[in-house]
A protein has these predicted regions:
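Transmembrane and membrane-interface helices of multi-pass
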Residues: 105, 124-137
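Short acidic/glycine- and proline-prone juxtamembrane loop motifs at membrane-interface regions
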Residues: 141-149
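Transmembrane-helix motifs of polytopic, lipid-linked glycan transferases
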Residues: 95-123
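Hydrophobic alpha-helical transmembrane segments
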Residues: 11-15, 74, 102, 127-129
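Specific aromatic-rich, kink-prone transmembrane helix
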Residues: 113-117, 149-161
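Extracytosolic helix-loop segments that constitute the early lumenal/periplasmic catalytic or substrate-binding loops
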Residues: 36-67, 71, 81-88
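Start-transfer (signal-anchor) and selected internal transmembrane alpha helices
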Residues: 1-28, 120-123
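Helix-to-loop transition at the C-terminal end of transmembrane segments
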Residues: 22-42
Length: 161
């Protein structure tokens, strides 16, 4: 899958959206991620098991913590692991959450790239209406929901048809 990055990289609206999303990733800590999602993924990193949901509940974890399946967990694990290692180096618990949010940004970027590949005539419209969508930005980067990950799988499936 070859994607011409130039069409995105040279668009100032792409840069505006990317900068805004990075700033939100660094400055906003959504409550659902802080209280539920990130602690669950960190518990999987600290105590790997074949049944992470059962183990998390047995250790007194919140049943609402991570109501997603294995694919969602596998998507989140690499970036959270990198953040977790950085947390250990610096002695804080900040970068695990940043890693979680970076994985959402990567899924968001994947959706944009696939849409650009499928609809190359409409690059500017895709950037303006998808990449800069206030709904997407609010749901993903402000509220902290992970819906962009299954959306990226859906768009990837459509792309591969």
């Amino acid at each position: 899958m070859s994607i011409d990055w130039k069409c995105l990289w040279h668009d100032p609206f792409f840069h505006i959206g990317l900068l805004a999303k990075i700033v939100l990733i660094l400055l906003i800590v959504p409550t659902v991620q802080e209280q539920w999602f990130v602690p669950f993924v960190v518990s999987v990193i600290e105590q790997p098991t074949l049944s992470p949901w059962t183990q998390f509940l047995q250790q007194g974890g919140d049943p609402l913590a991570f109501p997603y399946g294995l694919m969602m967990l596998l998507v989140q694990l690499p970036a959270v692991l990198i953040g977790y290692l950085a947390d250990g180096i610096f002695g804080i618990s900040y970068f695990s959450g940043v890693g979680f949010r970076v994985s959402l940004l990567l899924a968001d970027l994947l959706v944009l790239l696939l849409l650009v590949k499928m609809f190359s005539k409409y690059v500017r419209k895709l950037i303006v209406y998808y990449w800069l969508s206030p709904i997407l930005i609010y749901i993903t980067y402000w509220h902290g929901q992970t819906d962009i990950i299954p959306v990226s799988f859906l768009v990837l499936g459509l792309f591969l048809l």
